[in-house]
Design a protein with these regions (language model features):
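Glycan-recognition and catalytic cores of secretory/periplasmic carbohydrate-active enzymes
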Residues: 1-261
Length: 262
């Protein structure tokens, strides 16, 4: 709707919200305080729904429910890399519990949309924690192998049965193409491109905001439609120094005489 302005999309959005699984009710019931109440990736994907719908119904309860949900997740299932114990089903905060790679990239995308809609820095901090800790550790540099589950206290990356909710013949921690379950090999590639797409955000006063930090360059029209190129240079999060270089793009007027002579 934000792109087309077609009213039927708002009607469809309301219908989907009304008929779909209610994440607000899930939080109110205390489901996120207990194990095995929801699949780990369904949670990562669906937790953004109340804030997506908040664009249509600006009731603060939608944002508050998501924040309360994250508090419950951190307290009862949270892991230091920003994820939660969810080795298929939600599974507590024991450091030997696994966290699925699909959950990482899907939760990153959910947080990216939450930042885009609310501008809330808590969501941005959570996004960075996953991007710079969980995601790099589960994918090989050439993107040819992946780790289905990751443990915070990961001593051995071996084929071995562990105390996961689902144990795929002991292959969950082993790096490979089809180890664990193949869904993550199809899904892992979205993590970095979508993260890059959500480094910079437009502001209501025709400005631009760097809310999530990473080396990047953006071209945009700001203020009174002035074209600029902003380069960001940083080793963040290893170094908290960030350098922004801002260049105004000036269109040079060239005079051309006809006919052309080569």
């Amino acid at each position: 709707y934000n792109l087309t302005g077609e009213d039927f999309l708002l009607e469809l959005g309301h219908l989907l919200h009304r008929q779909s699984f209610s994440f607000i009710d899930m939080v109110d019931r205390g489901d996120l305080r207990r194990p095995c109440t929801i699949h780990c990736v369904n949670l990562a994907q669906g937790i953004k729904e109340p804030i997506i719908y908040y664009q249509q119904d600006t009731d603060r309860k939608y944002i508050d429910a998501v924040k309360e949900g994250f508090r419950d997740i951190r307290r009862f299932h949270g892991q230091p890399q920003g994820m939660y114990g969810g080795d298929e089903a939600l599974h507590g905060n024991n450091p030997t519990q696994g966290s699925e790679l699909c959950s990482a990239v899907e939760l990153m995308y959910s947080l990216e949309k939450m930042v885009e809609i609310t501008g809330d820095i808590d969501f941005a901090d959570h996004l960075e924690r996953i991007a710079f800790n969980a995601l790099p550790a589960q994918i090989s540099d050439d993107f040819m192998t992946k780790q289905y589950f990751q443990q915070p206290n990961q001593v051995m990356v071996t084929r071995h049965r562990r105390n996961f909710d689902q144990d795929h013949e002991g292959t969950d921690l082993a790096f490979g193409t089809l180890t664990g379950y193949p869904c993550c090999f199809s899904n892992m590639h979205q993590g970095w491109p979508k993260f890059t797409q959500h480094l910079w955000y437009a502001t209501p006063d025709n400005g631009i905001a760097a809310i999530v930090y990473s080396p990047s360059e953006v071209t945009a029209n700001v203020g009174d439609n002035v074209p600029v190129v902003i380069s960001e240079d940083t080793y963040y999060p290893m170094d908290h120094q960030i350098t922004f270089t801002i260049k105004e793009v000036r269109n040079k007027v060239k005079q051309v005489k006809f006919p052309f002579h080569l």
